[in-house]
Amino acid sequence: MKRPSLITLLLLLISIRLTAQESDGLAPEITDLNSADVSYNAEKNLPDLKHPFIATEPNDRNDGIPVGKLEKKDAVLAFTKEIAEGKHGDIDSLLLSLDGELIFESYYRRGRANYPHYQMSITKSYTAMAIGRAIQLGHLTMEDLDKPVVSFLKEIDQTKLVEGAKSITLAEAMNMKSGIRIDQSTAKELMKSQGKLKGQGQIQAYLENSAPIPAAPREFKYQGSDPSMTMQVLEAVVPGSAADFIKKEVLGKMGITNYGWQDDISDLPKSAAGSSMRSRDMLKWGLMTMNEGEWNGEQLIPAEFVRKATEKINTNPQGTSYGYFWWSHEMIVGDKNYLCKSGRGAGGQFILMIPALDLIMVITAHQKGMGKMLKTAEEKILPLFVSTNSQ
């Protein structure tokens, strides 16, 4: 029997690694009929901070975030010393919130309190919440989530769609189970005529050039087509544009004004990646999500939608689960499991929420690879808030 060559084995290992990253939300953005994210390259020009900024009693900036005081200073400061020394990669910020209060705020390297940091795939999570906001305002209903995407997109020529395309629901798109499969050669050819991908033409191209869509339940595949369809539905149902709706009714309601959000090839906001948020504003997303859609006494998103979005709808063999563009997995300390709900982005961007402890960890980074902070947070930070003896 002929043995596989070393090159074949290396390619197999790379394929396995990429598949694993795609199944936990940490893979680099893979574009087909989307514009590539440019925020990472833009931030390369930021000089590293000469000295880390570390606050164990963060300032009240009158931005809607309650502040408190870190009690377990020694252990946290020992860990942040390791971050500053580069022992955990290129970390840019670490914020901790406990019981709804920001108790620790720190910035390193390219991290800035007033500069939006690229988010990569957390943009998907924000897109899901924009759909939730549309439901809260009556532009959609919870029942609409189970309706076909094409039923909202009136410009789609349904006579040209591949078999099964009409059956893809909004809920399936937000759970990465559209079933759309476009090979790279076809995608490259379609990208040569970008004018045809403007507006709903982007979705027409996906649904017209995909392999036939199988009947549900379909296989989970982490890809750009599904959030693109979701953003197109938002554009179709809200007054004005999706961009204005996100600015006014989502970000504006949380006092988020200093942000970035790139346009996709469709001229709609990007959805698979492409947003930039300040670390404090990432925390706002976490606080609002942990509070089931409520922000400063106002119900911005239906609690039912938030629960569904952060639910374990699909669980992969690695034990990581996916809802509507939000992740969840179990963190372990000793013999106890703690459910962690999260937004995740390539390069090391995280909003990690531990409901049982009312704990939120916000992390930004510019890792060359994906970094190990997801596991490090479980091993180094979480135990400090589980054990009452840690100091």
Which residue stretches match the model-derived regions?
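N-terminal leader/targeting segments and the immediately adjacent pre-domain N-terminus
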Residues: 18-111, 137-141, 385-391
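Structured C-terminal helix/loop/strand segments within mature extracytoplasmic catalytic/sensor domains
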Residues: 21-34, 343-391
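Active-site SXXK
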Residues: 100, 118-145, 230-234, 282-289
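Short, charged, amphipathic alpha-helices and their helix-cap/turn boundaries
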Residues: 101-106, 148-150, 186-216, 240-259
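Active-site helix/loop module of the DD-peptidase/beta-lactamase fold
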Residues: 137-180, 236-277
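Active-site-proximal alpha-helical segments within enzyme catalytic domains
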Residues: 226-233, 273-295, 349-365
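Active-site Gly/Thr loop motif
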Residues: 256-257, 307-362
